[in-house]
Amino acid sequence: YLSGERTPHNSADIRAAFHQINTSTSKAAIIYSVLEGVAFGIKDGFKAVEAINKNTDETYIVGGGSKSDFWTNLVGSAINKSIIIGEDSNLGPSLGAARLAMMATKNFAGKDVFKKMPIRKEINIDKKLSEILNKRYAVWSEIVSTNLTIAGKLKIIKN
């Protein structure tokens, strides 16, 4: 969380942190840890959605990240779901906004607006990676919880 978070923590003050860095920590390890942290943040949001909507049989990735099989595999393995890359995944964010605008006009039926995106490919989870990520996520969740408390204390000191 580099600039605060709304879902599911609702804390504008939480920030990213690095743990267990030493003089032998490589640049690649730091870069990977950022990607893994973002994937865990996505998992937090995904879990919040699943808590109120169990209908998550298909999971699509959209935006620029959909161009990277590495990123798609990392996210899918983190959330324990195969990820679908649609033909229009790179347009996903703007297409979603356009669809919401169409629905707001009340001139379109949901069935006409929310059509299934043609599938370009599906990235299955890496079971070994998923097991490792689940263990790391448990620790990461503890760190986030602690960081939420620390962020609140730092805010008081700043003010």
Locate predicted features.
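Glycine/Thr-rich phosphate-binding loops that ligate phosphate moieties of nucleotide
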Residues: Y1-N159
